[in-house]
């Protein structure tokens, strides 16, 4: 049970993505249209060479902001092979359409794995 799921239908889930193309964002997770999601764990692992990694939260729910509004979760972190960054102990709340993206750079053949655990709380329609 989380802050937002008390007394509501909710489900915990884990997601994974591999970012393997330089300077191209890979979407780790997108919050569904009928949910609010609480991210309780985020793990970023470098599996190949020396790579710079950006992890961003793409905010889809701010109509007055530019369409490319994003917030940096991990900004230009230089990671050598085997390095990882683990975020726990805090909660990031995503609204419908929000996403978490991972973008590797500075390495011709990057391999960055991203894993997250979220609790999706269903938003009643109507």
Predicted regions and their residues:
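A short beta-strand element within beta-rich, extracytoplasmic domains
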Residues: 37-46, 99-102
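Short beta-strand/loop motifs in extracellular/secreted proteins, especially
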Residues: 40, 51-55, 110-114
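Beta-sandwich interaction modules
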Residues: 81-97
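Beta-strand repeat scaffolds of extracellular/surface proteins
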Residues: 47, 90, 105-107
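Short, surface-exposed beta-strand/strand-loop-strand elements in extracellular ectodomains
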Residues: 48-75
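Solvent-exposed, conformationally flexible loop/turn segments
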Residues: 19-24, 74-84
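C-terminal interaction-tip segments
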Residues: 1-36, 59, 96, 104-126
């Amino acid at each position: 049970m989380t802050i937002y799921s008390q007394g509501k239908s909710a489900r915990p889930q884990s997601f994974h993505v591999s970012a393997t193309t330089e300077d191209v964002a890979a979407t780790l997770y997108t919050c569904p249209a009928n949910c609010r999601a609480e991210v309780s764990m985020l793990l970023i692992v470098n599996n190949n060479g020396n790579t710079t990694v950006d992890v961003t939260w793409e905010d889809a729910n701010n109509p007055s902001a530019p369409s490319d509004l994003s917030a940096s979760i991990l900004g230009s972190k230089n990671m050598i092979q085997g390095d990882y960054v683990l975020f726990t102990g805090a909660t990031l709340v995503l609204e419908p359409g929000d996403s978490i993206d991972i973008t590797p750079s500075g390495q011709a053949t990057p391999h960055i794995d991203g894993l997250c655990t979220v609790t999706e709380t269903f938003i009643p329609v109507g």
